Amino acid sequence: DYATIGCRYITIPGTPYDEVPGAEHFDVMLEDTAKFGVMAKLHGLQLCYHNHSHEFVRMPDGEYGLDCIFRTIPSPLLETQLDLCWVNAAGEDPVAYLEKYAGHIPTIHMKDFVGKGKVRAEGVYERDGAPFVPHEQDEGEVALRPVGRGVQNVPALVAAAAAGGTKWIIVEQDEPSLGLSRFECAKNSIDYLKDPKVNK
């Protein structure tokens, strides 16, 4: 069905909790995903895996679960759809991950957030009408924001994605924030990404 409608990429958006890295049936997930990768190729599709923060658990050998997935199921059977919010929230540098998997990230989820202990990078471009809104303690560990209103260095992420051959930047707004509707958040994010100072 995906091939019929002209879809090029299909993505595993998440896995059951008993199949995440370090869980009891992680090996089952790896086996099934490899099979899906082969099936996708037979239909001219590219299978991708979308991460969350729980893939950044350390495996017994010290490797992150996310890296274990892509080592075990190498390209071209599986590519990554990096969710840049969850890379950062897990304590890693999303620019470094874009560089690490350059050439193997056809799509990304661009998402901004604030969180306890997270500091906005110096000199991040603040577009008129899109001010940085600090974290409120009652919002939990990660509070989502429209792109450009959180801690992410969005211009650096856009540049790294472009350099690595990313085809699609997908704005994701899991929940509305700052009193804006989901559509208002999405428009704010898209307007920020279209700004020439962000998307050079």
What does each of the following model-derived ranges do?
Residues D1-T80, K100, F183:
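Active-site acidic/histidine proton-transfer and metal-coordination neighborhood
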Residues G6, P60-G62, L66-K200:
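Histidine-acidic metal/acid-base catalytic patches
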